From Swiss-Prot:
Catalyzes the isomerization between 2-isopropylmalate and 3-isopropylmalate, via the formation of 2-isopropylmaleate. One of its GO terms (cellular component) is 3-isopropylmalate dehydratase complex. This is 3-isopropylmalate dehydratase small subunit. InterPro entries: 3-IsopropMal_deHydase_ssu, Aconitase/3IPM_dehydase_swvl, AconitaseA/IPMdHydase_ssu_swvl, IPMI_Swivel, LeuD. Belongs to the LeuD family. LeuD type 1 subfamily. It comes from Chloroflexus aurantiacus (strain ATCC 29366 / DSM 635 / J-10-fl). NCBIfam families: leuD (TIGR00171), PRK01641.1 (NF002458). GO terms for biological process: L-leucine biosynthetic process.
Length: 201
C-alpha cells in the first residue's frame, strides 16, 4: 500500500445520497479477485446508457471531470452489502479520497484498509462544495492527513476525524498485516519473557 500524506487534486461532485455498493459496482463484477480493471464497472449503470454508450449527463463523464482524484458525494455513501470491490473500483478509477457527510461503516473500513481515504465533512461544508463545484467545475482541494484538514478553494481549512491506527497505517503505507510484522521483534521478545506452562494432559 502506498503511503497517504497530502492529496491535492481536482474534485468531482456526485450529489446523490445513500449510494450503495451495488450502484458503485454491480454484482456481476465481483467474480474477480484482481483489483485492476474494476474501474470499468464503476457506477456502470449510471455511466452508460442502454446501448452501451457513455451517458453524457453523468458527472464523471463530463469533460471537466477528467483527471479528478477526489470524489464528493452525499451522506451514507457506500451503504448496502460489504463488498470490498466498491473501494477497489473507486481506487482503480483514480480516486484517492471520497468526501461525504457520512459513510457506511463497512465501506469506510474497507477503504481505509486499501489506502482510499474516506473524509467525513459537515453537511454544511458538503452543501458549500456542491454549490462551488456548480460555479467552478475545475475546483481543486487539498487534503492533509497529518493535520486532518481539508483546504477549501477559498483557503479555509476544515477538520475531519480519523482513528489513530488507521491514520498511522495510511501515513506509513502499511496494512494491518504490515503493522503486525513491524511489531515482530517486540512480539518475539514478549513471548520469550513469558514462557507458557506445558501440560501433558
Amino acid at each position: 500500500m502506498e503511503p497517504v500524506s497530502t492529496i491535492t487534486g481536482k474534485a468531482v461532485v456526485l450529489p446523490v445520497e445513500n449510494i450503495d455498493t451495488d450502484q458503485i459496482i454491480p454484482a456481476r463484477f465481483l467474480k474477480v479477485t484482481d483489483r485492476s480493471g474494476l474501474a470499468a464497472g464503476l457506477f456502470e449503470a449510471w455511466r452508460y446508457q442502454a446501448d452501451g454508450t457513455p451517458n453524457p449527463d453523468f458527472p464523471l463523464n463530463r469533460p471537466e471531470a477528467a483527471g479528478a482524484t477526489i470524489l464528493i458525494s452525499g451522506r451514507n455513501f457506500g451503504c448496502g452489502s460489504s463488498r470490498e470491490h466498491a473501494p477497489w473500483a473507486l481506487q482503480d478509477y483514480g480516486f484517492k479520497a471520497v468526501l461525504a457527510p457520512s459513510f457506511a461503516d463497512i465501506f469506510r473500513s474497507n477503504s481505509l484498509k486499501i489506502g482510499l481515504l474516506p473524509v467525513t465533512i459537515d453537511q454544511a461544508v458538503y452543501d458549500e462544495l456542491v454549490a462551488r463545484y456548480a460555479a467552478d467545475p475545475q475546483m481543486h482541494l487539498t487534503i492533509d492527513l497529518a493535520t486532518q484538514t481539508v483546504t477549501l478553494p477559498d483557503g479555509r481549512q476544515v477538520h475531519f476525524p480519523i482513528d489513530a491506527f488507521s491514520k498511522y497505517c495510511l501515513l506509513h503505507g502499511v496494512d494491518q498485516l504490515g503493522f503486525l510484522l513491524q511489531q515482530e521483534e517486540a512480539i518475539i521478545a514478549y513471548e520469550a519473557s513469558h514462557p507458557q506452562p506445558v501440560t501433558t494432559r
